[in-house]
């Protein structure tokens, strides 16, 4: 198993290290356009192997040819958000970057699974699919896992219980229009509505929607990277080990939830082939409407890029 990570910034480097530490691949390649950065970080990671107890070969490069024959390619390249900048502000600039990155990696790997982390996430997943020509089930966006992790952590913090006992789904686009599904949220099987007032639930939903911005405002000069990297690696682990985890991921919906040909967050079964099944769970009327509105925003942003994609 060979996994390439595009982008040696905070998210990419953290993800590469977690992949190595979990020994999910025999080889991890970290690629970035800045000379010396991927090489230095990769060497540092590799030298941690004896004490972190892994034998994965980690290398860095500025040459896409070193990504050849990758099984999974994690794309984290792109501009990070700054305070006051929405994900949509990044649209045109990052779409150009992702178009180039995808074109490059597809020259050297025949049928990889692409996992997108770059923002605006849902739209960049669409760009990668259009440029790569890969089957839709092999181009997946990391959004719902991260948003759900934030939702779960906030609930656990409020209730003072283990995060491991919080079960939840956050669907829809990765942004202000995401849809935390309260109906399927429980604590060790106990419905969240029996443990928390609607007012507190709604406050946590709003905090989840602004989870990324909250971190950006703290950091001032960067954005979240530990949780995004961990979320991406959770997806990779399910694929590599063919665990068939049910995870909320950005995928191309084909009529599910009344949404047609739009990349949007939904519960999927994630295995060795990528997205092996989309689970069309029952939603309340309000949740379904919110999900469809979220998908509509993603679709409009995708249409705005059609000229760029040709």
Swiss-Prot record:
<keyword id="KW-0520">NAD</keyword>
<dbReference type="GO" id="GO:0006089">
    <property type="term" value="P:lactate metabolic process"/>
</dbReference>
<dbReference type="GO" id="GO:0030060">
    <property type="term" value="F:L-malate dehydrogenase (NAD+) activity"/>
</dbReference>
<dbReference type="InterPro" id="IPR001557">
    <property type="entry name" value="L-lactate/malate_DH"/>
</dbReference>
<feature type="binding site">
    <location>
        <begin position="7"/>
        <end position="12"/>
    </location>
    <ligand>
        <name>NAD(+)</name>
    </ligand>
</feature>
<dbReference type="InterPro" id="IPR001236">
    <property type="entry name" value="Lactate/malate_DH_N"/>
</dbReference>
<dbReference type="InterPro" id="IPR022383">
    <property type="entry name" value="Lactate/malate_DH_C"/>
</dbReference>
<dbReference type="GO" id="GO:0004459">
    <property type="term" value="F:L-lactate dehydrogenase activity"/>
</dbReference>
<comment type="function">
    <text>Catalyzes the reversible oxidation of malate to oxaloacetate.</text>
</comment>
<keyword id="KW-0560">Oxidoreductase</keyword>
<protein>
    <recommendedName>
        <fullName>Malate dehydrogenase</fullName>
        <ecNumber>1.1.1.37</ecNumber>
    </recommendedName>
</protein>
<dbReference type="Pfam" id="PF00056">
    <property type="entry name" value="Ldh_1_N"/>
</dbReference>
<feature type="active site" description="Proton acceptor">
    <location>
        <position position="174"/>
    </location>
</feature>
<keyword id="KW-0816">Tricarboxylic acid cycle</keyword>
<feature type="binding site">
    <location>
        <position position="150"/>
    </location>
    <ligand>
        <name>substrate</name>
    </ligand>
</feature>
<feature type="binding site">
    <location>
        <position position="32"/>
    </location>
    <ligand>
        <name>NAD(+)</name>
    </ligand>
</feature>
<dbReference type="InterPro" id="IPR036291">
    <property type="entry name" value="NAD(P)-bd_dom_sf"/>
</dbReference>
<dbReference type="GO" id="GO:0006099">
    <property type="term" value="P:tricarboxylic acid cycle"/>
</dbReference>
<dbReference type="Pfam" id="PF02866">
    <property type="entry name" value="Ldh_1_C"/>
</dbReference>
<feature type="binding site">
    <location>
        <position position="87"/>
    </location>
    <ligand>
        <name>substrate</name>
    </ligand>
</feature>
<feature type="binding site">
    <location>
        <position position="81"/>
    </location>
    <ligand>
        <name>substrate</name>
    </ligand>
</feature>
<feature type="binding site">
    <location>
        <position position="119"/>
    </location>
    <ligand>
        <name>substrate</name>
    </ligand>
</feature>
<comment type="similarity">
    <text>Belongs to the LDH/MDH superfamily. MDH type 3 family.</text>
</comment>
<feature type="binding site">
    <location>
        <begin position="117"/>
        <end position="119"/>
    </location>
    <ligand>
        <name>NAD(+)</name>
    </ligand>
</feature>
<dbReference type="InterPro" id="IPR015955">
    <property type="entry name" value="Lactate_DH/Glyco_Ohase_4_C"/>
</dbReference>
<dbReference type="InterPro" id="IPR011275">
    <property type="entry name" value="Malate_DH_type3"/>
</dbReference>
<feature type="binding site">
    <location>
        <position position="94"/>
    </location>
    <ligand>
        <name>NAD(+)</name>
    </ligand>
</feature>
């Amino acid at each position: 198993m060979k996994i390439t990570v595009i982008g040696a910034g905070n998210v990419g480097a953290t993800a590469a290290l977690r992949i190595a530490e979990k020994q999910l691949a025999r080889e991890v390649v970290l690629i970035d356009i800045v000379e010396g950065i991927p090489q230095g970080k990769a060497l540092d990671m590799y030298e941690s192997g004896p004490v972190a107890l892994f034998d994965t070969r980690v290398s860095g490069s500025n040459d896409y040819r070193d990504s050849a024959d990758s099984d999974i390619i994690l794309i984290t390249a792109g501009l990070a958000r700054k305070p006051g900048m929405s994900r949509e502000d990044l649209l045109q600039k990052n779409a150009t970057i992702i178009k180039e990155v995808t074109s490059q990696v597809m020259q050297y790997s025949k049928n990889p699974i692409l996992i997108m982390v770059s923002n605006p996430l849902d739209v960049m997943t669409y760009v990668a699919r259009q440029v790569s020509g890969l089957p839709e089930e092999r181009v997946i966006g990391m959004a719902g896992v991260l948003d759900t992790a934030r939702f779960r952590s906030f609930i656990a913090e409020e209730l003072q219980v283990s995060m491991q006992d919080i079960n939840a789904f956050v669907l829809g686009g990765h942004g202000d229009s995401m849809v935390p599904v309260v109906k399927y949220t429980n604590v060790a099987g106990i419905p969240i509505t029996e443990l928390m007032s609607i007012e507190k639930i709604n406050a946590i939903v709003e905090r989840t929607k602004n989870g990324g911005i909250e971190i950006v405002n703290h950091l001032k000069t960067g954005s979240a990277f530990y949780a995004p990297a961990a979320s991406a690696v959770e997806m990779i682990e399910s694929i590599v080990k063919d665990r068939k985890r049910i995870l909320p991921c950005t995928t191309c919906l084909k009529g599910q939830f009344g949404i047609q040909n739009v990349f949007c967050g939904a519960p999927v079964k994630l295995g060795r082939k990528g997205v092996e099944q989309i689970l069309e769970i029952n939603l309340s009327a309000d949740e379904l409407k919110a999900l469809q509105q979220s998908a509509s925003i993603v679709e409009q942003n995708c249409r705005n890029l059609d000229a760029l994609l040709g």
